[in-house]
Amino acid sequence: MPESTPFAAPGPELWSRLGWTPDAGQREQLITLQELLRDWNTRVNLTRLVEGEDFWVTQVLDSLWPLKPELDTADTPRRCIDVGTGGGFPGLAVAIALPGAELTLVDSVSRKTAAVAAMARSLGMADRVSVRTERVERTGQDPRCRGQFDLALARAVASAPVVAEYLVPLLHTNGQALLYRGRWQQEDQRDLDPALALLKAKTVAIERCELPSARGPRTVIRVMPEQPTPHLYPRAVGIPSKQPLGIQADDNRS
């Protein structure tokens, strides 16, 4: 049976939770994005979160609430990167909400990146949304990407120390990494802090949100570089997830 709650469609209740309301064009783009995702999902297994609250709360709202400061200056030119974009979230939702931004969306699965690139074209955003099919460890060592971004985003990719190693090398001096997390506790921060020390970065803010309709707690960890990231990071493909910084012994602490 289709959901009939206030959060199952793009109405005022949804936007009041975000503190931001899309203009008519953005609202139409978000509706079109749902239609495109529904269509592509019949051909490529992108996500099960396509209908009703699954889409509007767990995809759109969850993608955008960490960006409340940026939504206040949505037309400001920014370079943003979404690591592990999967079915295009948060990247495509962010591109709609921040019309001044250029987005780079990264995923290692070619069938997913092909679908996401096609959706970006259908949404009329191909001029400012680019898609890369590669492991993010390679992205972070590519001079065209390393140290180039104002915002680096990752949602539901890996543990926080691993995500930090993926994102921090992509930031320029004043850039910020946004680590999308669920519940965040002191022990999570204790795991993250040693990784940030190795990356020459620091936590600058921890923001929390309770998604409506019992969708659970969410946290975003904002991280900034304090110095240029050591060239070692990110390490070779697969190493960050197998040997998370600060959790397992690291031979490069000295």
From Swiss-Prot:
GO molecular function: rRNA (guanine-N7-)-methyltransferase activity
Residues that hold S-adenosyl-L-methionine according to the record: 84, 89, 136-137, 155
GO cellular component: cytosol
SUPFAM superfamilies registered for this protein in UniProt: S-adenosyl-L-methionine-dependent methyltransferases
Keyword flag Lipid metabolism: no
Stored Gene3D superfamilies: Vaccinia Virus protein VP39
InterPro entries given in the database record: rRNA_ssu_MeTfrase_G (IPR003682), SAM-dependent_MTases_sf (IPR029063)
Domain of life, per lineage: Bacteria
EC number: 2.1.1.-
Subcellular location: Cytoplasm
Keywords attached to this entry: Cytoplasm, Methyltransferase, rRNA processing, S-adenosyl-L-methionine, Transferase
Cystine crosslinks: none
Coiled-coil positions: none
Region (Disordered): 231-254
Assigned protein family: Belongs to the methyltransferase superfamily. RNA methyltransferase RsmG family.
Function: Specifically methylates the N7 position of a guanine in 16S rRNA.
Protein name, as recorded: Ribosomal RNA small subunit methyltransferase G
